[in-house]
């Protein structure tokens, strides 16, 4: 996946009026993945996330717009995550002093409420590629376990 195009400037948007969706260049480059995600019900937002070696995203809580009766649930699915002995690549949820680690691996998925504080760590030798997707769910259907 190292030959995936990374943003080098403005991204073009394509409107599909039949589906009532807006697509980007990546949807034309990866039509099978686009169809799979669309057929799976992904409608809010989806993208491919690349985190380079030794990089990450510090602790934060996303303020995605959501209606009063909904929650945005974010998913992360490992596409190309080459973990070697002693390396770490994970999504941390909670707080810096009291958090949970969800290891990011090939074909493994994790879902969480995007307003919960979280961070991402990539201590690998290689970039890690993931699908990031958002689902909008009615609050009345979401249980806190």
Which residue ranges define each predicted feature?
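Catalytic core of non-heme Fe(II) oxygenases with the double-stranded beta-helix
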Residues: 30-111, 128-130
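Short catalytic/ligand-binding loop motif for oxyanion handling, primarily in non-cytosolic enzymes
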Residues: 57, 119-121, 139-142
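Structured loops at beta-to-helix junctions and adjacent beta-edge loops in soluble globular domains
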Residues: 1, 16, 49-51, 78-80, ...
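Non-heme Fe(II)/2-oxoglutarate
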Residues: 1-40
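Intrinsic disorder/low-complexity detector
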Residues: 5, 18-20, 27-28, 62-66, ...
């Amino acid at each position: 996946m190292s030959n995936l195009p990374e943003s080098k400037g403005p991204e073009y948007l394509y409107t599909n009026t039949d589906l009532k969706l807006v697509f980007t260049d990546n949807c034309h480059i990866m039509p099978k993945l686009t169809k799979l995600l669309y057929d799976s019900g992904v409608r809010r937002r989806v993208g491919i996330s690349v985190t380079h070696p030794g990089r990450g995203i510090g602790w934060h809580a996303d303020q995605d717009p959501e209606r009063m009766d909904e929650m945005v649930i974010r998913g992360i699915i490992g596409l190309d995550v080459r973990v070697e002995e002693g390396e770490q690549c994970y999504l941390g949820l909670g707080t810096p002093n009291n958090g949970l680690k969800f290891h990011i691996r090939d074909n493994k998925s994790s879902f969480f409420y995007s307003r919960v504080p979280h961070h991402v760590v990539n201590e690998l030798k290689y970039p890690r590629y993931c699908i990031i997707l958002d689902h909008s769910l009615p609050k009345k259907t979401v249980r806190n376990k």
